[in-house]
């Protein structure tokens, strides 16, 4: 049984109070960041998270289709199809989306990191990036297992094509790099083409990376 105090502390979201012409207004911290066009992609990627992220992207596009969106990523990865729904939405909307990894961008997290606008993909100095091929566990009749295995192969090929598109690496290099868990430092990720720049302080990129 989970400790109720731990559960409370882990789900406690800070509130911020803003003064307006109509008085005070309270926001949870993530809603306040959304007003600044900042989206936090934090934790495992799953259908619930992808729905929230896609909704935020579409909302910000509707508010201003020409103003950039900043996405902060700290994720171990997760469900491939959920991640692809976020990826497709990032490519679909009109605003440019900058990405910044804080902590880690592993598995689908790394794909979403490199899916940011070219020249606007960043990492903090001590962040880690990990790429690998998709995996899955299936059970049931042998025929069904074979069907799922073929689907996983198709997803693997599609993911490889996306990495090729955004990193500039050739297909053979991507396939070799994703064969096993491949951990990278920020410097390695930049050299491989997953990101464009390593940020140590806001400086001149303040307006782009938020």
Swiss-Prot record:
It comes from the Bacteria. Pfam families: CLP_protease (PF00574). Its main location: cytoplasm. GO terms for biological process: protein quality control for misfolded or incompletely synthesized proteins. One of its GO terms (molecular function) is ATP-dependent peptidase activity. It catalyses: Hydrolysis of proteins to small peptides in the presence of ATP and magnesium. alpha-casein is the usual test substrate. In the absence of ATP, only oligopeptides shorter than five residues are hydrolyzed (such as succinyl-Leu-Tyr-|-NHMec, and Leu-Tyr-Leu-|-Tyr-Trp, in which cleavage of the -Tyr-|-Leu- and -Tyr-|-Trp bonds also occurs). Keywords: Cytoplasm, Hydrolase, Protease, Serine protease. It is found in: Cytoplasm. Transmembrane segments: none annotated. One of its GO terms (cellular component) is cytoplasm. The active site is at residues 107, 132. CDD domains: S14_ClpP_2. Its EC number is 3.4.21.92. SUPFAM superfamilies: ClpP/crotonase. InterPro entries: ClpP, ClpP/crotonase-like_dom_sf, ClpP/TepA, ClpP_His_AS, ClpP_Ser_AS. Fourteen ClpP subunits assemble into 2 heptameric rings which stack back to back to give a disk-like structure with a central cavity, resembling the structure of eukaryotic proteasomes. Belongs to the peptidase S14 family. Cleaves peptides in various proteins in a process that requires ATP hydrolysis. Has a chymotrypsin-like activity. Plays a major role in the degradation of misfolded proteins. This is ATP-dependent Clp protease proteolytic subunit. The gene is clpP.
């Amino acid at each position: 049984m989970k400790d109720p105090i731990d559960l409370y502390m882990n789900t406690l979201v800070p509130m911020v109070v803003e003064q307006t012409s109509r008085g005070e207004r309270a926001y949870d911290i993530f809603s306040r960041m959304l007003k600044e066009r900042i989206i936090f992609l934090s934790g495992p990627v799953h259908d619930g998270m992808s729905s929230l992220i896609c909704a935020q992207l579409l909302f910000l596009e509707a508010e201003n289709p020409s103003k950039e969106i900043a996405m902060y990523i700290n994720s171990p990865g997760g469900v491939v199809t959920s991640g692809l729904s976020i990826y497709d939405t990032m490519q679909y909307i009109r605003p440019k989306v900058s990405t910044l990894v804080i902590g880690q961008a592993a598995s689908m997290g790394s794909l979403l990191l490199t899916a940011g606008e070219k020249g606007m993909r960043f990492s903090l100095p001590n962040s880690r990036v990990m790429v690998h091929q998709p995996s899955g566990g299936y059970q049931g009749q042998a025929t069904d297992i074979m069907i799922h295995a073929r689907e996983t192969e198709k997803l693997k090929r599609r993911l490889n094509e996306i990495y090729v598109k955004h990193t500039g690496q050739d297909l053979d290099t991507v396939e070799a790099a994703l064969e096993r868990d491949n951990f990278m430092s920020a410097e390695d990720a930049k050299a491989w083409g997953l990101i464009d720049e390593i940020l140590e302080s806001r400086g001149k990129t303040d307006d782009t990376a938020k």
